[in-house]
């Protein structure tokens, strides 16, 4: 936020994958970086994410066809959409979200996302080599699974867009799926094997290894809970849980879903507000059966 050319010092709030990546990138450009997190690197959302880096992520959730399907999704609740009364306070965001599902906005978004994904893929591979993490990297894609013909046909638009962007994919049917992943349920009739994708087997371990590289090259990690921010004439002041003030000439807020509440609580000028919606961060670990495993994310 508001980087001043007169200072090459920056504080990054949040030590998940985004925050640690920001810290590493700034450090590589010669900045003195302090990374602040109340629990430590890779302990919150980044501890349980999918660990997938895929060009198929160029497809945003708000895509053409969403508005037509919304009534069915609202009146036949399922895993894809559940609306709670508390979500109505975000109605303005919802309308903007739907507005940008129009094809012109969608086209701009997909081009921007694809450029970002392709750039970040190269950067992550470099960092993983520097952090001796090659053993955690899997370059064998991921599977988008469909239980029946209707679900497969419903993905036609998304598959067309991936083809337009030359994302490497293979179409699989039931017997192909079993050949590729023999331990998967036989309930799936179709799949799109997105080959233009990589994944890691332990996202939290990757974040922690990145953080170790950050410290090795002079970065500072500070454990603290950030309660408030205040804009200063020559930088920023942030306040911790003990009401102790800390000064930073430049600031990056990378607190994931907690970013919006911090910025609102800090009563900053409107240009610093972040209108956000985010997926709920549930994840569950299952005890594996001996000899049963998957070779790629599904």
How would you label these PLM feature ranges?
Residues 2-3, 15, 21, 172, ...:
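Flavin (primarily FAD) cofactor-binding/catalytic cores of flavoenzymes
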Residues 8-35:
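N-terminal Rossmann-like FAD-binding beta1-loop-alpha1 element of flavoenzymes
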Residues 92-213:
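Rossmann-like flavin
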Residues 172-180, 222-236:
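A conserved short coil-to-beta-strand element within the FAD-binding core of flavoproteins
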Residues 39-44, 240-294:
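Central helical "cap/lid" subdomain
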Residues 28-48:
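Glycine-rich FAD pyrophosphate-binding loop
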Residues 31, 167, 219:
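Short phosphate-binding/catalytic loops that engage adenosine nucleotides
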Residues 48-115:
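Glycine-rich active-site loop/strand segments that organize a redox cofactor
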């Amino acid at each position: 936020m508001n980087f001043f050319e007169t200072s090459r010092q920056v504080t990054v709030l949040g030590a998940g994958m985004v925050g640690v990546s920001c810290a590493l990138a700034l450090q590589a450009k010669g900045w003195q970086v302090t990374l602040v997190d109340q629990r430590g690197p890779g302990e919150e959302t980044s501890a349980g994410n999918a660990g997938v880096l895929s060009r198929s992520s160029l497809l945003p959730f708000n895509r053409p066809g969403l508005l037509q399907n919304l009534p069915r999704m609202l009146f036949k609740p399922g895993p894809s959409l559940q609306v709670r009364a508390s979500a109505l306070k975000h109605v303005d965001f919802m309308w903007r979200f739907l507005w940008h599902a129009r094809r012109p906005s969608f086209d701009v978004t997909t081009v921007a996302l694809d450029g970002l994904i392709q750039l970040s893929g190269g950067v992550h591979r470099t960092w993983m080599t520097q952090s001796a993490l090659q053993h955690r990297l899997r370059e064998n894609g991921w599977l988008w699974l469909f239980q029946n013909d209707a679900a497969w046909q419903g993905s036609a638009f998304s598959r067309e867009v991936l083809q337009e962007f030359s994302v490497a994919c293979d179409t699989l049917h039931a017997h192909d799926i079993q050949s590729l992943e023999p331990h998967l349920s036989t309930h799936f009739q179709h799949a799109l094997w997105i080959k233009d994708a990589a994944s890691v087997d332990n996202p939290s371990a990757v974040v922690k290894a990145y953080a170790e590289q950050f410290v090795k090259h002079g970065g500072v990690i500070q454990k603290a809970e950030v309660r408030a921010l205040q804009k200063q004439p020559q930088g920023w002041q942030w306040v911790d849980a003990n009401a102790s003030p800390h000064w930073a000439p430049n600031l990056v807020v990378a607190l994931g879903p907690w970013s919006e509440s911090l910025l609102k609580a800090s009563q900053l000028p409107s240009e610093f507000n972040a209108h956000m919606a985010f997926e709920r961060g549930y994840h569950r670990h299952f005890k594996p059966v001996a000899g049963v495993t998957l070779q790629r994310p599904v």
